[in-house]
Amino acid sequence: MEKSKKDGHQAVLNEGEENELEVFGYHTQNLRRALCLVTAILTLGAVQLMFYWRPEWWVWTSCIPCPLQEADTILLRTTDEFRRYMRKKVFCLHLSTLKFPISKNPEEPLVADHHSVINQAVMKPELKLRCIQVQKIRYVWDFLKKRFQKVGLLEDSNSCFDIHHTFGLGLTNEEQEVRRLVCGPNSIEVEIQPIWKLLVKQVLNPFYVFQAFTLTLWLSQGYIEYSVAIIILTVISIVLSVYDLRQQSVKLHKLVEEHNKVQVTITVRDKGLQELESRLLVPGDILILPGKISLPCDAILIDGSCVVNEGMLTGESIPVTKTPLPQTENTMPWKSHSLEDYRKHVLFCGTEVIQVKPSAQGLVRAVVLQTGYNTAKGDLVRSILYPRPLNFKLYNDAFKFMVFLACVGVVGFFYALGVYMYHEVPPRETATMALILLSATVPPVLPAALTIGNVYAQKRLKKEKIFCISPQRINMCGQINLVCFDKTGTLTEDGLDLWGTVPTAGNCFQAVHSFASGEAVPWGPLCAAMTSCHSLILLDGTIQGDPLDLKMFEGTGWNMEDSQVASCKFGMADSSTVIKPGPKASQSPVDSITILRQFPFSSGLQRMSVIAQLAGDLHLHVYMKGAPEMVARFCRSETVPKNFSQELRNYTVQGFRVIALAHKTLKMERLSDMDHLAREKVESELAFLGLLIMENRLKKETRPVLKELSEARIRTVMVTGDNLQTAITVAKNSEMIPVGSQVVIVEANEPGDLVPASVTWQLVGTQEPGSGKKDTYIDIGNSSVPAGKGYHFAMSGKSYQVLFHHFYSMLPQILVNGTIFARMSPGQKSSLVEEFQKLNYYVGMCGDGANDCGALKMAHAGISLSEQEASVASPFTSKTANIECVPHLIREGRAALVSSFGVFKYLTMYGIIQFIGTSLLYWQLQLFGNYQYLLQDVAITLMVSLTMSINHAYPKLAPYRPAGQLLSPQLLLSVFMNSCFTCIVQVCTFLTVKQQPWYCEVYKYSECFLVNQSNLSANVSLDRNWTGNATLVPASVLSFEGTTLWPIVTFNCISAAFIFSKGKPFRKPIYANYLFSLLLASAAGLTIFILFCDFQDLYRKMEFIPTPTSWRVSILIAAFVQFCVAFFVEDAVLQNRELWLFIKKEFGFYSKSQYRILQRKLAEDSTWPPVNRTDYAVNGKNGFYVNRAYESPEEVPKGKLKLEEQASEQHFWTRL
């Protein structure tokens, strides 16, 4: 590996990102390529088909390794556990095709931006660039860094100064043309794939290829009816798949196409404004925002402000205010300057600009940041086009099981070869019969049968108003054992109700103003803050914005209006929002308040602020609102009441949503200076005004659903952006934290100059004050959780980040009992879900889609309660806006999983049953007849496979999950035991029939019916070596062995279908599946009828020989005994949960899931959980474990962390 990197053969693409790839350079050799083509022709395309399935084989055989710089073929490999390969051709872009001269001087940059990779990728004097296109993204070879670099975006290394001054005046026409050629068009084009191409992709699926081989073989042997039935079913399946793919392609194409043809206005350097089609935009262009527009690219706002609807990307329909990137002189990268809050300056592609507010310069301008598939919308579309593969053990086990069945078939193949060669049968017939036995073990109906269960489950979910865009995830829902819930809008109501305000005066809280009286807030600084500190906008005469802001504003009784020319003392025009008292407002000495500038709220900063002017006032005023703990940090300490923490806790423990407000006077000489003020300067030295108290009620469905999940032993976790105390109270009120359980708050702090990173454990106690309501406090006295009581960890996003950075080895131990995660940013939510997955939890995530898109996408089953377009990144969407959808989905997932296992076991047994019967007949060169196969394959197996999964989910969630592994001992024993039973019965009847006095090897058909069956042995005297003539049934089919084995095999198939159709506790009983029950009863009745009837035409058609009635009764008894034994073993032994738990306990078998191992370990640790103490990281500032890949709460790496490597050897603590 290291050698490959040193010689330039290997590099990494998108290093540290979710879509990280390893790239290898190869050079095509014509001789090797010619040999591959000749081999493909000689093998009739078989080798070419293998190359299609495994592109790396084609590269390894037709190319030789070489440095990437010289390669014409690139082999890419994902760095995840799947290690998938892709092959890409290197192509060149020639700048000489441009219509203006290009300098060939290596010292002269091609574009003005000295950070641009374009300057480092151009080969001079050839004037060409080497490129590859991977999943819609173009990469160019960087000769300086010796790796492929992404184009179509501005480099992150640009500073705020670079953005404003390098690109502030626009690009020249020449630079636009260069960037246009290199970066490609600014369009997100989803090709509507031709039907023939979709068909080819479906048909070339490995299983369909094997199926085609099998059906060709069967058709060549005259087995037409069943082959035609399978062909029809396969064609229907392929057509439906192609239709679905085509519809999705058309829908996605229509969704993105309209954004490719937007007319926009840009600024061209030295030429002024110019109109052009949006597909011609390039990174660095200056985009003019005239008003309402659908953004065709990602852009950084540099002048003015605007309000956008980001619902398409975030699922949040609340308008978001964007502010310009500050003009600073430092060289810090612009994203680092704005920390995780850089998104407040970025306008994302696909979002709608609904209002613009020009600055003093008169225009709202933005620099194009990313184009095409590099944009936020492009990334969303790519996530749909190239979804992350499912790492579900069921599918891996299914593949292994198929390989095992194929191996059994190979054994049968050589067995058939040996038998037929021993009897000197012609080679062609020998090969054909051997191939027939090979194909018998893998049922061709298997893929359709496994798919049909998900189709039924999908339809049942649709009736519950749960929509699914990823049906293969339904089975995964059956394994969910942990569900993360957002709080606001998910567990609690969307809307907030005003409860009251708690103003301050003279460093003390004053009397509460209650909104229950119906009176508006009395005039004062607190009222002024409530009227102005919000992100509300007036759109078409309607006030729109965040529900919290709306409720707060309604409580003041003031009205809003837009003023395009707002007068102020500075005498400058500006587009501003003006607030005036309404008829319900308290009496005020102020006629109006003008909002001049806004610093928007973000989940990372947990605050917002505005600069406003009161009518008649000579000064400007700053108002701030946000999380109380955050706002208090920016206030002068003498203005914050001494009992601030206690007062805040009094309300948060009751489940109230608490917002703090603050204010200061801003002295300025010129209004133009306001636009250049840094947020840090504005938000400092404020005076604390008071608290706004709002109620956030639980939804009525929350408590019953959480109780149902708890009884089913499914862990529930709250992941919210709200206050920690509020989250704890909601968790207790909803009984997410059961009555009697203890809560331990985990508070972690970053390392200081002399103090290492630390983590403090505080036990939250509960007491009953005199008022009768429960209060929550920090219990300092206790040093451990009381024995016998459960405990739950609660922490904030800040603490989670510190733990992730400095105490990563301890994080899994906390997560095993972590229940409340508050003040979590979107990136932290995604990271938390991933960390739970590393502990082998199957994680469900339920949220309203606002800040949960990443977590919904990361979870095994993301359930969005939002109907916005962003939910396309979530596998499931519920139109019912409460969490009742979660148990519905889990129930259907469990039922679908059990159905899949049942169908898989049945079809496996069906293959083995037929394999054993056919092998026995092969011993004497015989075979079942076509109609015998047809009845088993079509009337029984095919219909069973299509109806077994119709069974509905059981209405109550069981307190345990269904088996999730096909290779589990129970399932393997089930298949093995049933195989043994059917083998014993078939072999015994096969040998016993030979011992009957009336037995002979071959009979003349008509004579069998002329004799008295009860006296058959006395009346029939035929030569055992008689071979019949052309008018008789072929000797290879007509035999007593075949006539005996066929009903045994058929009854075995019916028995297996009944035994494996498991009902309670995950599905309704078998009799509730009316169609399936009727089918089994009909199949059993038909088989008995054929067994005992004496219709000559029927026997001739079925190719049977009549046998004595006593023998037929013996066959029925043998089949019934086999059914009883198999049913008893399956139901009383293999499916006996208590018995298996006892066996596991006696033999010391325990779950190998990481969370189970940790639970057992912690249960034996008397010092866990630590309470009322502080632990420090021993090796100073970096703690005992540092994850270097973790950069920020918004950019948490995916799948790059390894839990086991350092967890054991670096677990050192010091205690305070």
Curated annotation (Swiss-Prot):
Active site: 486
Reported tissue expression: Specifically expressed in brain and stomach.
Its membrane topology: Multi-pass membrane protein
InterPro entries, sorted: ATPase_P-typ_cation-transptr_N, ATPase_P-typ_cyto_dom_N, ATPase_P-typ_P_site, ATPase_P-typ_TM_dom_sf, ATPase_P-typ_transduc_dom_A_sf, HAD-like_sf, HAD_sf, P-type_TPase_V
Keywords assigned: ATP-binding, Glycoprotein, Magnesium, Membrane, Metal-binding, Nucleotide-binding, Translocase, Transmembrane, Transmembrane helix
Swiss-Prot/TrEMBL catalytic activity: ATP + H2O = ADP + phosphate + H(+)
Residues that hold Mg(2+) according to the record: 848, 852
Residue positions with a glycan: 650, 817
GO molecular function terms noted in the UniProt entry: ATP binding; ATP hydrolysis activity; ATPase-coupled monoatomic cation transmembrane transporter activity; metal ion binding; P-type ion transporter activity
One GO CC annotation: membrane
Transmembrane portions of the chain: 33-53, 198-218, 222-242, 401-421, 433-453, 896-916, 933-950, 971-991, 1040-1060, 1075-1095, 1113-1133
PROSITE patterns: ATPASE_E1_E2
Pfam families in UniProt: Cation_ATPase (PF13246), Cation_ATPase_N (PF00690), E1-E2_ATPase (PF00122), P5-ATPase (PF12409)
Subcellular location: Membrane
UniProt-listed Enzyme Commission number(s): 7.2.2.-
Top-rank lineage group of the source organism: Eukaryota
Record Gene3D superfamilies: Calcium-transporting ATPase, cytoplasmic domain N (3.40.1110.10), Calcium-transporting ATPase, cytoplasmic transduction domain A (2.70.150.10), Calcium-transporting ATPase, transmembrane domain (1.20.1110.10), HAD superfamily/HAD-like (3.40.50.1000)
The protein's enzyme class: translocase
Family per similarity comment: Belongs to the cation transport ATPase (P-type) (TC 3.A.3) family. Type V subfamily.
Name this polypeptide is given: Probable cation-transporting ATPase 13A5
Annotated organism of origin: Mus musculus
